[in-house]
Amino acid sequence: MTFEIYIHVPFCLRRCGYCDFNTYTAVDMGAGASRGNYANMVIREMAIVRDWQTTHGINEPKVATVFFGGGTPTTLKASDLVAMLDAVRATWGIADDAEITTEANPDTVNADYVKELADGGFNRISFGMQSAVPHVLATLDRTH
């Protein structure tokens, strides 16, 4: 049996009209709210889960898949995503052939961002392009 981890990043630049996922935009979060501490909180939660597993004698194999989904994980800094991945590695270990993916919005990444992810161990990016047809994008409230 494989051990796989999903890390939810519930932030988006804007809400898409069709989306039913648990997501938040800056407007939803309100004045003064910040995504800045999110990675640290996820890392703390990993430690809590690992402590619980240890207490209950649960020893998972190395992680075979790590998937960052959302929302739009790439609304966080690349260094935050890498820090969370590093915490997975330190907490459970990651298999040598693991698939490590983040969902991304083309509006939130550039070549430097992608390079930082690759250097940090990510080996797959899923760009959620819904359409290239302008009127379809307008209907979906999407930019891509």
Predicted regions located by residue number:
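N-terminal [4Fe-4S]-dependent radical SAM core
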Residues: 1-6, 56-60
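A generic fold-level signal
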Residues: 11, 60-61
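Alpha/beta-hydrolase
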Residues: 7-9, 129
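Residue-level signal for beta-strand positions within conserved beta-sheet cores that form or flank
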Residues: 1, 17-19, 96-98
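Local cysteine-cluster metal-coordination motifs and their immediate loop/turn environment
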Residues: 10-23
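Conserved non-cysteine loop/helix-boundary elements of the Radical SAM core domain that shape
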Residues: 24-54, 61-144
